[in-house]
Amino acid sequence: MFKYILKRLGLAVVAMFIVMSIVFFLVNATGNVPLSATSARDIAAVQAQLQEFGFNDPIIVRYFRYWAKLFSFQADALGIYYANPNQTIGEIVFARVPNTLYVVLISFLIGSLLGIFLGMVSGLNRGKFLDAAINVLVVLFVSIPSFVVGLGLLKLAGFLNLPPRFINFDDAFFSFDRFLLASIIPILSLVFYSSAAFTYRIRNEVVEVMNQDYIKTAKSKGLGMFAVARYHIFRNSIIPSIPLFVFGISGAFSGGFIIESLFGVQGVSRILIDSVQVNETNMVMFNILFIQGIPLLASVFIEFIYVLVDPRIRIANSSNVSLLTKLKFLSSRHQWLMKWNKINSDNAQNIVFNSPLHHQLLELNAIDYKTKTVQLTTEQKTALNISATANFILLGNKCLKLKTIHG
């Protein structure tokens, strides 16, 4: 299991590296710079700063310089925030992380729990009115974009006298009661989509599980529908749906881009959008690392949970050939091919298996299969009519080294 988790973690790191590399080249391909000038004096200063920050260097040079600095693990490893070099990127981003995590994680938690509940209810009532009603809602919430739902909820907020704007943690007039009221609309905007995805998946899994023989056996033993659903249907429906949690978290972060702009949430997504427009490369890269890193780490954690609850993965993983074994096999095969490439009609003699010559070699105890050699004296080679130029003996599908010994 440990090897399996390490493998998934390694794949996550590779995926993150590829994503960040693509983003780096896309952002720098725009040609924008994060510095601007309003006078002739400013132009000279800006040009000097561009030279200092390395913007005049080729993009490939800046790319390798970025990774070298990132892996230096120094205080400024994340790079410079060009708009305000006195403030570090970490300070700016982490000041807004609580707002993003609050909206995203709370909406994901509520959406997943609501989706699991509605999926169970819909699946257990397959073909009934309740199932049809839930399916209609699922189709609506999947089809309608989150920003359209958000605009509709803004109208609803005005009708219910709810705050239309989100109250951030660092607001000057922050109060807990107003904060909770202002959180309802942004969170609901993300809840509907995530709950719809969970509902659809869980409902299909429940329908499939209910057709299994062990469910019919449980019912025939006299178990009620609630007990069957609790002990048999729920667990066997959740296990195949575990990977959906990864997509749910990623979807919540993706939806957060629009929700933060729509409801005034001072989060990480707002920084990313602003930074892309002015080519704040270091800020963009760190935001991508943060926004994509959490779903990737969540995917590794969920893979770990998946291995614990589903023994089939452990069995499949234990039956796989390890990378070290594959490398050993390739190395031995390469050596075998190199040996056969050295063999030709001039330096090898073919001996048929179970032939008289083969039996004579056995009687002389000349064949050593362990060391893959045939050891003969010069007189024995002459008596057996073995060529004096032969260095190898081909016996069946084996290639044995011919050695001359002094008897």
From Swiss-Prot:
Q: Does the keyword Transport apply?
A: yes
What keyword terms does UniProt attach to this protein? Cell membrane, Membrane, Peptide transport, Protein transport, Transmembrane, Transmembrane helix, Transport
Please list the residue ranges annotated as the ABC transmembrane type-1 domain: 97-307
Which superkingdom heads the taxonomic lineage of this protein's source?
A: Bacteria
Q: Where in the cell is it found?
A: Cell membrane
* Predominant location category: membrane
Q: Which GO terms describe its cellular component?
A: plasma membrane
A Gene Ontology biological process noted in the UniProt record is: protein transport
How this chain sits in the membrane, per its record, is: Multi-pass membrane protein
Entry keyword annotation includes DNA-binding:
no
- What is the annotated quaternary arrangement, including any partners? The complex is composed of two ATP-binding proteins (OppD and OppF), two transmembrane proteins (OppB and OppC) and a solute-binding protein (OppA).
Briefly state the protein's biological role.
Part of the ABC transporter complex OppABCDF involved in the uptake of oligopeptides. Probably responsible for the translocation of the substrate across the membrane.
Q: Which PANTHER family match?
A: INNER MEMBRANE ABC TRANSPORTER (PTHR30465), OLIGOPEPTIDE TRANSPORT SYSTEM PERMEASE PROTEIN APPB (PTHR30465:SF0)
State the family it belongs to: Belongs to the binding-protein-dependent transport system permease family. OppBC subfamily.
Can you name this protein? Answer: Oligopeptide transport system permease protein OppB
